[in-house]
């Protein structure tokens, strides 16, 4: 209780200091014809940002600033990040459009210039598990008071998604009116569906580096991140017939569970690359299910902790209902379906048609067109 009170006091002080500094930054800076892309998901550009930046560079007369940096775990790292935030605040103040792919404190708690537009493209194509305002007060969710202090997911002018079904979910998760959510899609869809041939080149490099992958079909296991829980991978590893299948394990970046080296692929190959390459994808509550469905790959859900996860987090999609034949608590049932080649593609098709309406290779283009509209209104 004391720790929570101290945290709340510290957050109020942080918020006040940021607003105080930002007030003077706004006073002494002018907006430029600038677009700033912000992220704290990673220290490097996501494929969504790479594709957006590439298209934005084709627009004459605009400046593009990209700032991607995770919040460090160390105390000294956090102190340095505070100074880095001031730099981000400057670029926000001098921009006409800001694009984000997750919660960013400087976007949500500050009061921005009226004509500056903020576009949230989120870092997931859809949401099987609940998040944001859907899980406030739950074990895996945010503290209600802290979410209120930090203005969680405030100030967005537009939130992009890939379907009407996802629009309903995002409206709850971001606590916003559906009119602010637009079905523009996500750039990553253009990438995995082969626009420009970039992913095919990546797969070729993968096979050149890991030649043993050429000889057998590949099973990819990519679960979601679980707070305060290390994954036990022994059952999965022992159950897969290594004589017949390659097994690749790709954990969430925040998951530090131990994975034997033989099942790992270098992180220069993204999870999207691995989905594209693999023949079968096993996940649980991860949003990679949507990319897998977009590629019409065999998709399986290994839900060994179903009851616990529903209670601590909650789900937007009842997987046992939607994927009756490929959702199970028993890994051997999945492997049996793979072995018998008896996958139900009709269930996958219904899921894809409901949750992904933007399979036309124009996702990046639609978002860029929206950015253009924002710039034109500001000129």
Model-derived regions, located:
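Catalytic binding pocket for nucleotide-activated donors in carbohydrate/polymer assembly enzymes
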Residues: 255, 260-261, 287-355
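Conserved catalytic-core segment of nucleotide-activated headgroup transferases in glycan assembly
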Residues: 44-55, 173, 181-260, 328, ...
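A donor-sugar binding/catalytic signature common to diverse glycosyltransferases
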Residues: 98-105, 109-112, 117-122, 267-313
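Membrane-proximal basic amphipathic "stem/tether" segments
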Residues: 1-42, 79-83
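C-terminal alpha-helical cap of glycosyltransferases
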Residues: 360-379
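Helix N-cap/beta->alpha junction signal
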Residues: 102, 162-165, 253, 285, ...
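Active-site and donor-binding regions of nucleotide-sugar-utilizing enzymes
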Residues: 34-196
């Amino acid at each position: 209780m004391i720790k929570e009170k101290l945290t709340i006091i510290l957050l109020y002080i942080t918020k006040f200091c940021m607003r105080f500094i930002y007030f003077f930054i706004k006073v002494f800076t002018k907006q430029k014809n600038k677009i700033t892309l912000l992220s704290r998901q990673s220290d490097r550009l996501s494929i969504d940002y790479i594709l957006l930046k590439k298209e934005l560079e084709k627009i004459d007369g605009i400046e593009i600033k990209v700032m991607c940096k995770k919040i460090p775990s160390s105390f000294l790292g956090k102190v340095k990040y505070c100074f880095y935030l001031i730099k981000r605040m400057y670029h926000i103040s001098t921009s006409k459009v800001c694009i984000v792919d997750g919660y960013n404190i400087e976007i949500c708690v500050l009061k921005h210039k009226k004509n500056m537009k903020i576009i949230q493209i989120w870092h997931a194509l859809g949401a099987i598990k609940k998040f944001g305002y859907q899980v406030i007060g739950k074990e895996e969710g945010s503290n209600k008071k802290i979410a209120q202090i930090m203005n969680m997911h405030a100030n967005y002018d537009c939130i992009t998604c890939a379907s009407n079904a996802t629009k309903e979910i995002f409206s709850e998760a971001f606590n916003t009116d559906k009119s602010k959510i637009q079905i523009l899609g996500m750039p990553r869809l253009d990438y995995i569906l082969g626009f420009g041939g970039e992913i095919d080149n990546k797969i070729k490099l993968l096979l050149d580096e890991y030649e043993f992958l050429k000889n057998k079909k590949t099973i990819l296991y990519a679960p979601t991140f679980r707070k305060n829980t290390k994954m036990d991978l022994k059952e999965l590893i022992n159950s897969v017939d290594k004589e017949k299948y390659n097994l690749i394990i790709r954990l969430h970046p925040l998951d530090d569970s131990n994975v034997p080296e033989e099942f790992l692929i270098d992180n220069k190959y993204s999870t999207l690359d691995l989905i594209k390459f693999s023949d079968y994808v096993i996940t649980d509550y991860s949003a990679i299910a949507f990319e897998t469905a977009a590629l019409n790959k065999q998709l399986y859900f290994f839900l060994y902790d179903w009851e616990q996860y529903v209670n601590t987090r909650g789900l937007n999609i009842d997987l046992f209902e939607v994927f009756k034949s490929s959702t199970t608590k028993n890994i051997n049932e999945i492997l049996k379906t793979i072995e018998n080649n008896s996958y139900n593609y009709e269930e996958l098709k219904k899921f894809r048609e409901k949750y992904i309406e933007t399979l036309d290779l124009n996702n990046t283009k639609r978002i860029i067109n929206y950015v253009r509209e924002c710039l034109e209104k500001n000129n």
